[in-house]
């Protein structure tokens, strides 16, 4: 522990002890003395209440094993991890072991049946007092309380936007398409279309979006029937109305790849219109040389979102509406640079120098 003593040659000698990190020499802990006991044994008995962290048993070795809602430390100390009641018990699956556990309620016995799920609190207790229930329902975290005004404002704006969208959908199917849907089913039809659009926007395909929208409304009707105590006949009637409404909407209404409501287009018609679009674009070619060419291409893509998926439309736009056209001499590459050209500098690896390429405005799609 001490590597040595250093003394001075002067009259007033100072002893300096140098301590190093060497391991202490082995020896008896008690040095042959009768030391105090370690206070082993039970600290909590059968039926006593415990809090998390309270020690139940101190022991040398595992005389008792940890059961439910307790843990064992490195010195074999058993302590509670949940508030409850101490139970000493035997487990028929381990006949030679004695267990200590914590029951979550006083009427609960251990061990529980072996194949039953564990009883857990999930950090919650049941409230019986109406005042406490109301207080808990209205309670907000600090973060929610500080941002309450912003949250309420955003919620109000979302609800207003949702209702506006539902009104627009109803006007579209009643005024433009003139579907035979009675006004009493306005909310049902609008809600279905809103859910249908949300499913498409979240990445579902057509059938999945339709199924999820209808399933949601079916479950809401069943909950409403349970809440308002409808009889079976009334619930069946409402579900039948939902089936009729959704079937009519599915064959009358669709959405573009920008999630705008449009009249229904069959898969065969979509393929036909796609082939026609590709044919017309091929006739125009990829080299757009004038403003009229640009206008013609944009006109072709005007309704493309109705029958193309977003990926298909992006692919065709990249193919036929290149932001920078390929270099063609005397078409979009000038002989010399001037005020009307855009100079592009490119390193030429063969000649080890920078080439200066003057491009005309016809080389850039946005400048046409």
Swiss-Prot record:
Keywords: Mitochondrion, Ribonucleoprotein, Ribosomal protein, Transit peptide. It is found in: Mitochondrion. InterPro entries: Ribosomal_bL27 (IPR001684), Ribosomal_bL27_CS (IPR018261), Ribosomal_bL27m_C (IPR041244). Residues 1-20 form a transit peptide. Residues 31-44 have a biased composition (Basic and acidic residues). One of its GO terms (biological process) is translation. Coiled coil: none annotated. GO terms for cellular component: mitochondrial large ribosomal subunit. It comes from the Eukaryota. Residues 23-44 are annotated as: Disordered. One of its GO terms (molecular function) is structural constituent of ribosome. Component of the large subunit of mitochondrial ribosome. Belongs to the bacterial ribosomal protein bL27 family. NCBIfam families: L27. This is Large ribosomal subunit protein bL27m. The gene is MRPL2.
């Amino acid at each position: 522990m001490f590597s040595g003593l250093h003394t001075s040659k002067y009259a007033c000698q100072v002893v300096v002890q140098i301590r190093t990190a060497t391991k202490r020499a082995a020896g008896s802990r008690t040095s042959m003395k009768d030391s105090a006991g370690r206070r082993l044994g039970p600290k909590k008995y059968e039926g006593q209440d415990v809090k998390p962290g309270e020690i139940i048993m101190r022991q040398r070795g595992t005389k008792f094993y940890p059961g439910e809602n307790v843990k064992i430390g490195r010195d074999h100390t058993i302590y509670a991890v949940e508030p409850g009641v101490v139970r000493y018990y035997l487990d028929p699956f381990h006949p030679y072991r004695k267990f200590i556990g914590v029951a979550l309620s006083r009427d609960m016995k251990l061990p529980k049946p072996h194949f039953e799920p564990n009883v857990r609190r999930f950090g919650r207790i049941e409230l019986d007092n109406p005042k406490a229930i109301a207080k808990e329902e209205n309670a907000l975290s600090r973060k929610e309380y500080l941002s309450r005004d912003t949250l309420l404002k955003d919620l109000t704006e979302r609800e207003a936007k949702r209702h506006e969208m539902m009104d627009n959908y109803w006007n579209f199917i009643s005024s433009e398409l003139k579907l035979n849907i009675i006004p009493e089913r306005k909310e049902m039809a609008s809600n279905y279309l809103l859910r249908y659009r949300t499913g498409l926007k979240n990445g579902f395909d057509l059938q999945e979006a339709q199924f999820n929208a209808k399933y949601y409304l079916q479950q809401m009707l069943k909950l409403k029937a349970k809440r308002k105590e409808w009889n079976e006949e009334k619930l069946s009637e409402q579900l039948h109305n939902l089936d009729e409404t959704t079937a009519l909407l599915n064959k009358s209404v669709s959405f573009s790849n920008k999630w705008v409501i449009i009249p229904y287009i069959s898969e065969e018609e979509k393929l036909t219109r796609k082939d026609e679009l590709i044919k017309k674009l091929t006739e125009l070619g990829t080299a757009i040389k004038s403003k009229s060419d640009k206008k013609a291409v944009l006109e072709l893509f005007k309704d493309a979102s109705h029958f193309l998926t977003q990926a298909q439309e992006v692919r065709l736009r990249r193919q036929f509406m290149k932001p920078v056209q390929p270099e063609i001499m005397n078409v979009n590459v000038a002989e010399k640079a001037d005020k009307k050209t855009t100079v592009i500098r490119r390193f030429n690896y063969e000649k080890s120098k920078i080439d200066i390429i003057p491009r005309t405005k016809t080389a850039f799609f946005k400048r046409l």
